Design a protein with these regions (language model features):
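Conserved acetyl-CoA-binding loop-helix of GNAT-fold acetyltransferases
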Residues: 1-17, 38, 123-133
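Conserved GNAT acetyl-CoA-binding A-motif
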Residues: 8, 13-28, 135-145
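Ordered hydrophobic segments in well-structured contexts
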Residues: 22-24, 95-98, 103-108, 115-118, ...
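Basic (Lys/Arg-enriched) interaction patch that binds polyanionic ligands
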Residues: 26, 32-38
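Short alpha-helical
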Residues: 30-31, 124
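Active-site/acyl-donor-binding loops of N-acyltransferases
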Residues: 37-57, 117-170
């Protein structure tokens, strides 16, 4: 086996010994899905990229990391992967964090385009958020479609596959 596979197996052993019940990852490319499948991972959480145009501006509020984390726990679907601590600090280092009516998002704006790294809530709110932030368009990844976004490897039989994994810094 290759060095990468050996390192992954060592990582899995360490995670099991540390009490984790599974591992989640986002392959860097489509071709890597098959490699991770050979290690026992299964694709889950289908997502699709969408473009959004502005609508009528909505009321939004900028948040700090702690506020975002608290609201994220409320917006996550049941059995969603809880990503906190260093991950949210890293996310906030490259994005601004916002809440709006029925939504929560992490986004960065480059020129006239808003790049939304995570969106939780009612997708109907997106056009208003795009307008409120002064963007001419947005790129966002939302649940749906047929292609899995992430992969999961369970270490125990008594846990079900996560329902949502949304933060990826691509």
């Amino acid at each position: 086996q290759g060095l990468s596979c050996q390192l992954m197996k060592m990582t899995h052993d360490h995670l099991r010994e540390s009490g984790y019940y599974g591992a989640v990852l986002v392959p860097a490319g489509v071709g890597l899905f098959s490699m991770y499948e050979k290690l026992g991972y299964r694709g889950f959480c289908p997502m699709e990229r969408r473009s959004v145009l502005p609508g009528v501006p909505a009321a939004i509020e900028q948040l700090d990391v702690e506020q975002y984390a608290a609201l994220r726990r409320q917006y996550l679907p049941e059995n969603g992967v809880l990503q906190e601590g260093a991950m949210l600090d890293f996310l906030a280092g490259y994005n601004r964090l916002y809440s709006g009516q029925n939504c929560l998002l992490a986004a960065a704006q480059e020129e006239d385009t808003l790049y939304i790294q995570e969106f939780l809530g009612d997708a109907e709110a997106l056009p208003g958020v795009v307008a409120a932030l002064g963007a001419k368009s947005a790129k966002v990844r939302l649940p749906g479609g047929s292609k899995p976004f992430a992969m999961y490897l369970g270490f125990t039989e008594d846990r079900q596959e996560p329902s949502y994994f949304g933060i990826a810094l691509d």
